[in-house]
Amino acid sequence: MKANNHVVIVGGGAAGLSAALFASRAGARVTMLEKNEKFGKKLYITGKGRCNLCNACDVETFLKNVQRNPRFLYSALRFLSPEDLQRLVNDLGCPTKVERGNRVFPVSDHASDVSRAFLDGLKGQALKINAEVLGVAVEDGRVTGVRLQDRLLPCDAVILATGGVSYPATGSTGDGLRFARELGHTVTDLRPSLVPLEIKEAWPRQLQGLSLKNICLTAAVHDKIKYCEQGEMLFTHFGISGPLVLSLSSVLATADWKDVKLSLDLKPALTHEQLDARVLRDFGEAPRKQLQNLLPALLPSRMAEIFPALCNVNPTKQPAQITAAERARIVGALKCLPMTVTGARGFEEAVVTCGGVSVKEVTPATLMSKKVKGLFFAGEMLDVDAFTGGFNLQIAFSTGALAGNSAALYETEEQA
């Protein structure tokens, strides 16, 4: 027998839309309250506006890409797996496709089609924009409603799906986290994750806009390697960004950046000895060329221009003039070019928030609060975050779906 609970969902992003749909399908009367002027505002900027809505991998692979509290997500991913989400979105009238790295996008390449598909599935329910919630009303340890500007809206269950504090321009200003604290929940330290890094040295800024491919980025904390991956990186006006850097920022989101030592291996396919032999060969094949004219065979031209200074070698020297010590510095810098991190960029540029409502205080099988009956959490509000590639949106959709279904049914199950 289906429930007839009145479920209020605070937040109309990916988690809120999913919660509303699954609560509705479980028989609940749904009111979704979004303080922005439209639903799914953050969805519109995900995947560069194309909405990388999930990753077409199995659950075990998925969990390996979750950085904090992956096991907490087992129930949510069993309820709505990546395969289930693709099927759901297709059934809602938004065909999907799988691209490089198993990233799933709408065929149209328009994020708006994803949010529209969910909204079309919610016809007949109360969906309100420009609706700011001031707090959650609780009596005797049980949710009784939400406080609006002008009144109390009574309900049987509340799902907080207001997001974290990343990209605050999209409305993610931490409202739900404040409500959670007011209700006695622990909110772990919040840090920006999947975010560019600021570098002390000046030379990365000289290379602003240059993208390096097939390089290896290594990070050590107190001389212990914590991250070592190959891929792509981008130099910016403040430091570094790109896929490798965003992943690194996720792995070390809780670290003190002053303890982190970064290094670039510009030729990871070659060992130190192989690279030294390659440099010697290049020198031997062009004995009259200056160093600055030899380096473009090894590096992008813009980087080749500044590289001699990084090695403290005169760029006009010919191979015969380069000492063994200087050649060693050149090879050493190609294999291990150090950078000093001064910090991560702020929440304004972070893809996701590291930290949130402590999962120790939330029941993973239902996503209901262990402190307040009828209070549920979904999405980025929870202390769970993952790498790029559709993983964080999947977390939002899956936790939203489970919370929505649980909120619709929880009183019925208690009375059974």
Regions found by a protein language model. Give the residues of each.
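Glycine-rich loop(s) and the adjacent beta-strand/alpha-helix scaffold that form part
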Residues: 157-203
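Short hydrophobic core segments
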Residues: 8-10, 33, 133, 153-168, ...
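A glycine-rich dinucleotide-binding beta-alpha-beta segment and adjacent secondary-structure elements
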Residues: 129, 135, 305-385
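N-terminal Rossmann-like FAD-binding beta1-loop-alpha1 element of flavoenzymes
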Residues: 6-32, 403-408
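Glycine-rich active-site loop/strand segments that organize a redox cofactor
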Residues: 50-98
